[in-house]
Amino acid sequence: MNIQDLPFLPVYFDRYITQIPGDLELQDAFEQFAPEVIFSDTDLLLQLGDQVYAPGKWTAKDILQHCIDTERIMTYRALCISRGETISLPGFEENLYAQNTVAATRTVEDLLDEYNTVRLATRMLFQHMSEAMMLRTGSANNAPITPLAIAYMILGHAVHHKNVLVERYYPLLTSNGV
């Protein structure tokens, strides 16, 4: 299955889903957009340290933790919907979650190890869903969504944050003479 099989693009998450080529089959997308591929520039992440491009913004480690947390939450939503859950699953406040982690005390390598482990579980969940399960419509944060859309949202969300790092964080390294 691929993005073209989606019965609709969910509001808000479309900006993440469209980061992934529409004809890319889901399991191929999981390979092409694996954390170790998207965030393969570990040296740059390490060089960034705790630098941020503006006051109040997250560090690179905060971004990795956010991607991990979001993937876990989205995977839970996909599991619930695929199994027939009918209640609207709750949203979450990403900044509150970011304030309540220990990402600052962790290494980039440790975060990437966790991310890869979470991704393996995510991939296995979607690999063993039927087409009907993938296309079942449920509700999250009071908006309709399908597990297939969630899968591509997870991948596109990581791409989005990689782009933020490239566009806003990595230039800090050259401006600081690193």
Predicted regions and their residues:
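A short small-residue
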Residues: 12-17, 95-103
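Phenylalanine-focused residue identity feature
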Residues: 8, 13, 30-33, 39, ...
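Amphipathic, non-membrane alpha-helical segments in soluble helical-bundle scaffolds
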Residues: 20-30, 57-64, 105-115, 148-151
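Acidic/histidine-rich alpha-helical segments that form the ligand environment
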Residues: 28-42, 97-135, 154
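Short, contiguous alpha-helical
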Residues: 1-10, 47-94, 135-178
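Terminal targeting/low-complexity segments that flank the catalytic cores of oxidoreductases
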Residues: 1-32
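Short, contiguous, helix-prone interaction/anchoring segments in small proteins
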Residues: 21-56
